[in-house]
Regions:
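Sec-dependent signal peptide recognition
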Residues: 2-10
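Post-signal peptide N-terminal segment of mature Sec-exported envelope proteins
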Residues: 26-49
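C-terminal motif of bacterial Sec signal peptides marking the signal peptidase cleavage site
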Residues: 15-18
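Short, Gly/Ser/Thr-enriched beta-strand-loop segments that form substrate-interacting elements
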Residues: 84-101
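Secretory pathway targeting signatures of secreted, lumenal, and periplasmic proteins
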Residues: 53-74
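Bacterial signal peptide processing site
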Residues: 20-23
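A short, solvent-exposed beta-edge/loop patch
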Residues: 98-146
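A short acidic-to-branched-hydrophobic micro-motif
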Residues: 68-88
Length: 146
């Protein structure tokens, strides 16, 4: 009888621990070089450059200076923060800096510690598909969570 009680208790404990929800935090760091390589795998060829005319997009955010690239004559910048939390602070800083500005059209892409601005300057009211947006997102989605 003692063995049966122990078996029931063990089964109950296993059942209860299986029902407990746990949050998974992805702590793996993505480097700028890994992002550039992933983009190249999706046929996005970047050229390094320095861009003054779109200064707000290449400014330091939360102490991080981004990598500046050209994609089909448009600016794309890649911020590599140390952590996702640092990236969130950078996002908030950008929102604060640009709150009262009238910016050109751009897309923001986020993945873990990475933030990308693609300054495509397309009219957002048109039905035109913005080039490279899908490919950039797919390249970032190729980084497996966990």
């Amino acid at each position: 009888m003692n063995g049966l009680k122990q078996a029931i208790i063990i089964c109950m404990l296993l059942f209860l621990t299986g029902c407990v929800q746990t949050e998974v935090y992805d702590s793996s760091h993505i480097s700028e070089a890994e992002v550039v390589e992933a983009l190249q795998n999706y046929n996005i060829d970047l050229t390094e450059g320095t861009f003054v005319e779109e200064e707000i997009f290449v400014s330091k955010l939360n102490g991080v200076k981004p990598g500046e690239y050209e994609l089909n004559e448009k600016l794309i910048v890649i911020y590599e923060f140390d952590t996702s939390e640092e990236r969130e602070k950078g996002e908030k800083e950008f929102a604060t800096k640009t709150a009262s500005m009238n910016l050109v059209s751009y897309e923001t892409f986020i993945k873990r510690n990475i933030m990308i601005f693609y300054v495509h300057e397309e009219h957002l009211n048109s039905n035109k598909i913005i080039p490279f947006v899908k490919e950039i997102q797919e390249a970032l989605d190729s980084f497996i969570e966990g």
